């Protein structure tokens, strides 16, 4: 038997859920296939969303009509603003979630999406389009076949997945779930080069066996925060957590009376005994014994790797994070490990707060297949097979947020492919999502890729606070958000621009009355005429103070005040980055034809020629960012493009 769809999404992790939602919202009849429908968007590792750069991605996903931000807000047990003392470019939200509640809310949300069908099935094979159907054929373990002109693979860690703890190894996509073996074979048969990557997860502890009096409290924010954009103009507010019943009584110091109920996290530190136990057992560590072949993420190393690499460090911080409102299971952030089970028990019990701890689940490593760099284009489509899209860990990334961002863009572009519309490609100056995808299509990924603020050249323009101003107008044009939401965002943009213009034009003079009013509200007096914007540019001055001192200033919403303050305090830096973007866009707008012949370019180095032919950059800007390409190579390509254009004009 067979059934036909417009778009088929294989895998329902964070990438697959966003991909299926976007494709269905854009009018495509969409099928989401997953091994277990009860584990949609399952948090296999850390029960958290956000962090530096990752939080920016989630804000952008929400601004584009995606799901991750709002479901995080509804399932969060704690939310915090990181890097609060630093500038707005690197400030980022991070939330602890109830992992089972998150998965349930995602499933309930997707079940209500028109045009979207959910099916529980193991995908065994994928066959390319043939002349008769012009569709991919996706075959499940029962033999049922599904046909579609566009398929999105979001396979996570399931491609030939292998779990490892000590000397024990077993096939698994994650603990308790079978790997996808045949799918790897099909991808290899289609010509896709596969690489082996590795990730890991820490033990989970029984909260009742932890001495929380020996831990350091990590409370949630006292100030309302959210990943989703909520507009009071539309009657929206930050939603409360959707849990049923009181929190598990094992967690001390719950924050139940603030702006929303929250649970704290708790910090402990490793000990000299902890380090000694690991060193004595390195010969049993799969990471060092040769059992593990895959390359792991450099920026999220296992605890045994930390002890070896940072041998001079006396202790490492570990965070005990509740996995939900009503569960006693506690995640040990910072303790990823694949050491043997007895070693895990011994090392954790060497920490004073964990002397009597019981492990509910042991830590393990997962090895899995990913597709080598250079196989996808900027629309998430594969170079070898048009209509086939990849998103998430199959592209060599790590992290829920990176996966969700790719899934969203793959879903949009798969829908556009089916509908004959042009692809949607975000630039590096438009979004962190654009930086992420550009890196995946222009850089050699030798280890699991993680997003950082340092990867974004224009991070002061790509802040979390302005994600909707940057991206919601596009989402409205695409059909991912409604007109009411877009209108509110546009009104805020206009209010911000008008307020900034007023403040740059409004001058105040150093009279006795003005200075007395400024000082009365905690603002240093002025000695010469200045604009309101110049006063607000002072780091310590807030708009509310200034308006109290100068009552004729306009009343503004909190959202507009935030934009106005950033616009004044960072105006010079913002203007500089905008000039850099303008220069860069000249290169980005210079398209390189897909069939451009690099073999005939005189003067182009052999290394550059090989790189260019492998990655086939779409623009001159992309070409310049490829590893192994220097400015001289770019100049040769530019000269050839101009000559080709001149020849076409002459003809």
From Swiss-Prot:
Subcellular location: Cytoplasm
Chief subcellular location: cytoplasm
Keywords associated with the record: Cytoplasm, FAD, Flavoprotein, NAD, tRNA processing
Alphabetical list of Gene3D superfamilies matching this protein: FAD/NAD(P)-binding domain, GidA associated domain, C-terminal subdomain, tRNA uridine 5-carboxymethylaminomethyl modification enzyme MnmG/GidA
Entry keyword annotation includes tRNA processing: yes
Chain positions recorded as NAD(+) binding sites: 296-310
Pfam families, per database record: GIDA, GIDA_C_1st, SAM_GIDA_C
Cofactor requirements of the protein: FAD
Annotated PROSITE patterns: GIDA_1 (PS01280), GIDA_2 (PS01281)
Signal peptide: none
Residues reported in the UniProt entry to bind FAD: 11-16
One example of a Gene Ontology biological process annotation: tRNA wobble uridine modification
Molecular function (Gene Ontology), one example: flavin adenine dinucleotide binding
Assigned GO CC terms: cytosol
Disulfide feature: none
Domain of life (superkingdom): Bacteria
UniProt xrefs under InterPro entries: FAD/NAD-bd_sf, GIDA_C_N, MnmG, MnmG-rel, MnmG-rel_CS, MnmG_C, MnmG_C_subdom, MnmG_C_subdom_sf
SUBUNIT field: Homodimer. Heterotetramer of two MnmE and two MnmG subunits.
Described purpose of this protein according to its UniProt entry: NAD-binding protein involved in the addition of a carboxymethylaminomethyl (cmnm) group at the wobble position (U34) of certain tRNAs, forming tRNA-cmnm(5)s(2)U34.
Family as reported in the entry's similarity comment: Belongs to the MnmG family.
UniProt name for this protein: tRNA uridine 5-carboxymethylaminomethyl modification enzyme MnmG
Species: Chloroflexus aurantiacus (strain ATCC 29366 / DSM 635 / J-10-fl)
